Amino acid sequence: MPKICYEVRGEYALFTNPMTKTGGDLHSYPVPTCSAVTGLTESIYWKPSIKWKPLRIRILNPIRYQSRSKLLPVYKTGGKDLGYYSYLRDVCYQIEVEMAWGSERYASDRNVAKHYESMLRWLRRGGKLPVHLGITECFAYVRPCLFGDGEGYYDAVDMDFGVMVHSRDFEKGVIRLAPYRMHQGVICFPDQEECITRTGRAGGD
């Protein structure tokens, strides 16, 4: 199946852990999760007959955080409380994904060339839907690219980010976890079968 490469950049990003997303404070993972990359890609182009499998991501800019306070509603009292969000700042990634077939119910729409060309067309336009980096207030800009093109801040760096969320199964209430390791600026996403599974909350990215 065909692969697509694109660059995504934004002023802010916030990729949260759905198992610890409680209260008014949010802290971003240092890099996008596999499920966040899936959501990014589906915002560019998606149909029920296809799905996108994230393969790898290249981290181009330094990983930097910036904290901001926010007034959040307290629904029990009707008042407001102060929460702190810890965002990633000035992010830029190169992403490679592979097209795969989606639901069998839409097998009649399995036209590789049509979906590939539609994806490229919407990618050049900046996405069919608004593209966000983790949460809706973090707007993103996308464009086609050649994976590995240009210089990246971590091109000579290896780094271990520990175990992070890989993806989720909302119907089963399962969260998949996987170790995230960067080699020369690139993180390769493992297959779902290689992940550790946990039962937990299914909100956030």
Identify what each model region corresponds to.
Residues 17, 52-53, 106-107:
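Short, hydrophobic/aromatic beta-strand segments
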Residues 3, 54, 90-94:
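Extracellular structured ligand-interaction cores
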Residues 1-24, 183-197:
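N-terminal, Lys/Arg- and Ser/Thr-rich interaction peptides
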Residues 72-205:
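Internal, well-folded beta-alpha domain core
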Residues 27-67:
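Glycine/small-residue-rich interface belts in oligomeric ring/scaffold proteins
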Residues 8-14, 61, 95-103:
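Beta-strand elements of well-folded, non-transmembrane domains
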Residues 18-23, 65-74, 108-110:
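Surface-exposed beta-strand edges and their flanking turn/coil or helix-capping segments
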Residues 20-40, 117-130:
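Short, flexible N-terminal segments of the mature chain
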